[in-house]
UniProtKB/Swiss-Prot annotation:
Name of the protein in question: Eukaryotic translation initiation factor 3 subunit F
Organism, scientific name: Aspergillus clavatus (strain ATCC 1007 / CBS 513.65 / DSM 816 / NCTC 3887 / NRRL 1 / QM 1276 / 107)
Family annotation (PROSITE patterns): MPN
Pfam families referenced in this protein's UniProt entry, alphabetically: JAB, MitMem_reg
Localization: Cytoplasm
Function: Component of the eukaryotic translation initiation factor 3 (eIF-3) complex, which is involved in protein synthesis of a specialized repertoire of mRNAs and, together with other initiation factors, stimulates binding of mRNA and methionyl-tRNAi to the 40S ribosome. The eIF-3 complex specifically targets and initiates translation of a subset of mRNAs involved in cell proliferation.
Lineage: Eukaryota, Fungi, Dikarya, Ascomycota, Pezizomycotina
Family indicated by similarity: Belongs to the eIF-3 subunit F family.
Subunit structure: Component of the eukaryotic translation initiation factor 3 (eIF-3) complex.
Primary location class: cytoplasm
Biased composition (Gly residues): 322-331
Keyword Protein biosynthesis: yes
Segments for region (Disordered): 308-345
Keywords: Cytoplasm, Initiation factor, Protein biosynthesis
One term under GO cellular component: eukaryotic 43S preinitiation complex
Length: 345
């Protein structure tokens, strides 16, 4: 899901420029992973009742040219906010950041988030800290992500970077001009399946859902596609009957989508599908045969070891008996010779 707003990127300074340093002024695009959004929502649900918003740190990756930032994970940072001042536990933030970077060396600090769409002086203070030199993202801009979590309303997400404003250096420390940047919540097939499974539990009273098997997931996907096709067909019929206004953009999109469909006869598709099913069955049969053969081989090897141990024990006992018999006969012969010598004497 991408933001549909339009943006104008202008070259801008990102903070007090030090001698010999050059800030990044390239356009920026933000990519957000779903797990980062879930982490922010979980933090918002666990906040104190008297807190209007909570804040935290954004971690992720940045492209080599710095024009794209991918937000992958977050962690909460404690803060206290009143009408007059704001206090942020920066020591905790630094320690947690060091631990996260040690566990995930490929990730870097990219910015911070807040569960409120409001931008105020305190937002500028926190933004200047995250975008500063040393412990901040300098020379890259810090991304400020706002996620509105107001009950009963849809979740709204916005992404910003900042440019310094202020007449004096003292005023520039708590001032910043927030510039909206385009963002995209990007997810793959695995994340999409997980999101669909989670969303299916929202209408249940116990807030629980069952995990679908691969066949059930495929069936649901096919049903969704058939529903989309029916909805598009009804729209096209209503446009043809002049019951709905025509849209050139939508018509072009449908034309491009139909152009992606392969030009294959239904009989060929059925034949290829049946061949694929046969191949799958053959592979499954061979796998079961190999597994049975391995189990049989293991059992035969175990039986041979058991029989070999029993026969070896019997043979060793017989050999000990023979040695004992020989020892007995030798002793008897020596006694007879000793008796004969005594008789001659």
């Amino acid at each position: 899901m991408a933001d549909t707003d339009s943006f104008l990127h202008l070259a801008r300074p990102l903070g007090p420029v030090a001698v010999g340093s050059a800030p990044t002024t390239a356009p920026l695009n933000v990519v957000i992973q779903p797990q980062a959004i879930f982490s922010i929502l979980d933090h918002s649900l666990r906040r104190n009742a008297d807190q209007e918003r909570v804040i935290g740190t954004l971690l992720g990756t940045r492209s080599e040219d710095g024009t794209e930032v991918e937000i992958r994970s977050t962690f909460a940072v404690g803060h206290t906010e009143t009408t007059d001042q704001v206090e942020v536990d920066m020591e905790y933030q630094k320690q947690m950041l060091a631990l996260h970077l040690k566990a995930n060396p490929k990730e870097v600090l990219v910015g911070w988030y807040a569960t409120s769409s409001e931008l105020n002086t305190f937002s500028a203070l926190i933004q200047n800290f995250y975008s500063g030199q040393g412990d901040g993202t300098w020379p890259h801009p810090a991304v400020h992500l706002t996620v509105s979590t107001e009950a009963g309303k849809d979740i709204e997400t916005r992404a910003y970077i900042s440019a310094p404003v202020g007449v004096t250096a003292e005023r520039a420390a708590d001032s910043a001009a927030f510039i909206p940047v385009p963002y995209e919540i990007r997810y793959g097939e695995a994340e999409k399946s997980g999101l669909e499974a989670i969303s299916s539990a929202r209408d249940a009273e116990n807030r629980a859902t069952n995990i679908f098997t691969d066949i059930e997931a495929l069936e649901r996907a096919i049903e969704d596609v058939l529903g989309m096709i029916d909805r598009v067909s009804r729209y096209v019929e209503s446009v043809i009957d002049e019951e709905a206004p025509a849209s050139t953009a939508l018509g072009q999109f449908l034309l491009n989508t139909l152009a992606l469909a392969p030009k294959v006869e239904p009989a060929d598709i059925e034949r290829d599908f049946n061949n694929h099913i046969q191949d799958v069955l053959v592979v499954s049969y061979l796998a079961n045969t190999i597994r049975t053969q391995m189990e049989l081989s293991n059992r035969l090897a175990t039986a041979q070891l058991t029989l070999g141990g029993e026969s070896g024990g019997a043979e060793s006992g017989a050999q000990r008996g023979q040695r004992g018999g020989k020892g007995g006969r030798g002793g008897q012969q020596r006694n007879q010779e000793r008796g004969a010598e005594e008789a001659r004497a």
